[in-house]
Design a protein with these regions (language model features):
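Active-site recognition of the HExxH zinc-binding catalytic motif
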Residues: 59-72, 104
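Post-HEXXH active-site segment of zinc metalloproteases
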Residues: 55, 71-102
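Non-catalytic architectural context of zinc metalloproteases
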Residues: 19-25, 58, 87-93
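Long, well-structured alpha-helical subdomains associated
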Residues: 94-98, 108-137
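Substrate-binding/catalytic groove segments of enzymes
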Residues: 69-82, 113-123
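Active-site scaffold of zinc-dependent metalloenzymes
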Residues: 22-55, 71-72
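Zn2+-dependent metallopeptidase catalytic core
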Residues: 1-14
Length: 137
């Protein structure tokens, strides 16, 4: 999934991505992304809850990869402990209302469809998504 996403949406970037599977019950989430540096980040760790259904796992990974893309392209930034999205301070906005989260939740669904469609075309998938619309990220 990660290789598919990077090849499709960030092919010219040299990135290091570690994926860690562990219990995130105490963190009250299914996954999160950490960058080792906030200045032109290229090294990332994606932490994923180790006990998820396959569909939740895939969508959560895609959600975090959207955030990775936001960081790499510079639309998501951290300055002085504050989160900025497209130049706007979003730190005081509730989590589910933050614009970068809204984008990631929307795109995780679209990417899930696109990923499965691409896997079907390559003979690796198990779903039939031929009739679903195309989209661009």
């Amino acid at each position: 999934i990660t290789t598919w996403f990077i090849n499709k949406y960030l092919p010219r970037h040299k990135l290091t991505i570690d994926i860690v599977h562990r219990s995130l019950l105490k963190d009250d989430c299914y996954g999160f992304l950490d960058a080792t540096s906030y200045s032109r980040p290229r090294d990332f760790t994606i932490s994923l809850h180790s006990k998820m259904k396959e569909i939740d796992y895939v969508k959560t990974l895609l959600h975090e990869l959207v955030h990775l893309k936001q960081w790499v392209e510079g639309s998501l930034k951290m300055k002085s402990g504050r989160t900025y999205y497209k130049g706007k301070n979003v730190s005081d906005i509730k989590y589910y209302e933050q614009p970068h989260e809204l984008e990631a939740f929307k795109l995780q669904e679209e990417l899930y469809i696109q990923y499965n469609r691409d896997m079907c075309k390559s003979g690796k998938g198990k779903y039939n998504f031929k009739k679903l619309p195309q989209f661009t990220l």
